[in-house]
A protein has these predicted regions:
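Cyclic nucleotide-binding regulatory module and flanking cytosolic helices
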Residues: 6, 15-65, 109-110, 114-117
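Cyclic nucleotide-binding regulatory domains
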Residues: 42, 67-129
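Short aromatic/basic micro-patch
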Residues: 45, 103, 135, 202, ...
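Short loop/turn motifs at secondary-structure junctions and domain boundaries
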Residues: 52-53, 69-73, 193
Length: 254
């Protein structure tokens, strides 16, 4: 672990050497963090020199659907940012049972609480679509947290917002009935992921069950009931919300 005993950043490049990947050839598609349109919003608090430090210590990788970006239990040597595509974050439970936490979107920081607890990834991240991702040396993050108060506060806000969202989900999953839980998921994809009432359902029925804590058969049955009652239209992977007010009511009443 690297510790820095001063608060200014005049000699940052003498402390952290730019990322060296040995003999592996890597071509970055993003020219720099400064010009990236999908960069994490908290980077706005960095000085130009600090942002250059981040840029010098990152590398990009492209993943196909189904490939693992981060593995639960592996070392947290890097922070992950997605430049494009969608991925699922999930806990690998016992007996092959997974619990999907959220859908990872471009421009978001992917860094679990384990980074500051046991230096292990708390969950697995797998690509749903083709994904272009940036990996940034976690020691750079530790350094910036120590020397840049605004950046540190932004990181705390990010982690706190995710923790609050997870707590809310846990309460809803424990207190709502199956119809309410599935309504929550459909609204999540509409409001957060796609921002549209009509979208391609990127999760299988099995994965929807892993997200809502119910069996695949229950997901199929409730989707059919919602369609028969005119609340949604469902055709293979396509979902269209026809009666948003009714779906919200189902979500609220659980």
């Amino acid at each position: 672990m690297i510790f820095v005993s001063f608060a200014d950043t005049r000699n940052l490049k003498t402390i952290f050497k730019p990322f060296n990947n040995g003999n592996m050839s890597v071509v970055n598609l993003i020219s720099s963090c400064e010009t990236c349109t999908r960069r994490w919003k908290n980077f706005q608090h960095l000085t130009k020199e600090e942002l250059n430090l981040v840029n010098d210590n990152r590398y990009e990788a492209t993943f196909k659907p189904g490939e693992i970006l981060m593995k639960q239990g592996s070392p947290t040597s890097n922070a992950l940012f997605m430049a494009s595509g969608l991925a699922k974050t999930y806990i690998e439970g016992q007996n092959g049972k997974n619990f999907i936490l959220s859908i990872a979107l471009p421009g978001r920081l992917i860094l679990g609480p384990g980074a500051y607890v046991d230096s292990r990834h708390t969950y697995t991240v797998a690509a749903i679509t083709s994904v272009q991702a940036c990996f940034i040396n976690f020691e750079i993050f530790r350094h910036l947290v120590r020397v840049n108060g605004a950046f540190a506060e932004g990181l705390l806000e990010d982690i706190s917002a995710k923790s609050l969202g997870s707590l809310t989900r846990m309460v809803n999953l424990s207190q709502k009935k199956m119809h309410g839980r599935l309504a929550d998921a459909l609204l999540y994809f509409s409001d957060i992921v796609f921002k549209n009432d009509e979208y391609e359902m990127i999760l299988s029925r099995q994965e929807l069950g892993e997200m809502t804590n119910m069996a695949k058969e229950c997901v199929v049955r409730i989707l059919k009931e919602l369609e028969d009652s005119g609340v949604i239209y469902s055709d293979s992977s396509k979902i269209k919300i026809l009666d948003r007010d009714k779906l919200v009511q189902i979500s609220v009443k659980g």
